[in-house]
């Protein structure tokens, strides 16, 4: 990952993997650029002291696309699946109001639901925002006890 440790390098690699996966609609690049802008404008750019900064978000997105590319050999992940995985990975930890470094999934979902620009980007990509939110909820860690129960309850709604 060291060779892609800058935001521009990660951005370029993500775009390359999207194109390789047959996803070349402008809305996905707009989503990527909007994410970078959001993180940086909320003080969560590369200089942010904590782990959950723009680099983490882009690295997770990159690794998600890379894993999906490897799995595409078995044809289990469809192009549509890839669009959902990309979108959920891109926003899985965005919580600008966080008081500690670990984001809270409910805050992430609230942001996704209320941010007008992001809702428009998701709409333009023909994705169901509820599926994106369910995928993000499934990143809850640890997946036990109250965390698991609360996430499953929200997913089932």
Model-predicted regions and their roles:
Residues 102-117:
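Structured all-alpha helical bundle cores of eukaryotic regulatory proteins
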Residues 52, 56, 92, 102-105:
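Histidine-centered active-site/metal-ligand motif
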Residues 60, 80-99, 108, 133-142:
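His-Asp-centered metal-binding catalytic motifs of divalent-metal-dependent phosphohydrolases/nucleases
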Residues 28-36, 54, 58, 82-86, ...:
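Short, well-structured alpha-helical segments
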Residues 119-157:
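Histidine/acidic-rich helix-loop-helix segments that form or flank divalent-metal centers
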Residues 39-50, 89-93:
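Glycine-/proline-rich flexible loop or hinge segments
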């Amino acid at each position: 990952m060291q060779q892609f440790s800058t935001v521009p390098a990660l951005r370029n690699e993500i775009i390359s993997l999207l194109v390789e996966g047959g996803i070349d609609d402008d809305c996905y690049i707009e989503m990527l650029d909007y994410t970078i802008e959001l993180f940086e404008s909320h003080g969560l750019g590369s200089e942010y002291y904590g782990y959950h900064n723009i680099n983490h978000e882009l690295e997770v997105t990159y690794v998600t696309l890379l894993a999906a590319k490897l799995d595409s050999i078995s044809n289990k992940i469809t192009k549509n699946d890839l669009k959902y995985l990309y979108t959920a990975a891109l926003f899985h930890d965005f919580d600008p109001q966080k008081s500690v470094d670990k984001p809270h999934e409910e805050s992430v979902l609230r942001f996704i639901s209320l941010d007008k620009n992001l809702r428009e980007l998701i709409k333009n990509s023909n994705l169901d925002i509820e599926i994106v939110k369910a995928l993000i909820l499934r990143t809850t860690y640890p997946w036990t006890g109250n965390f698991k129960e609360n996430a499953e309850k929200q997913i089932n709604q």
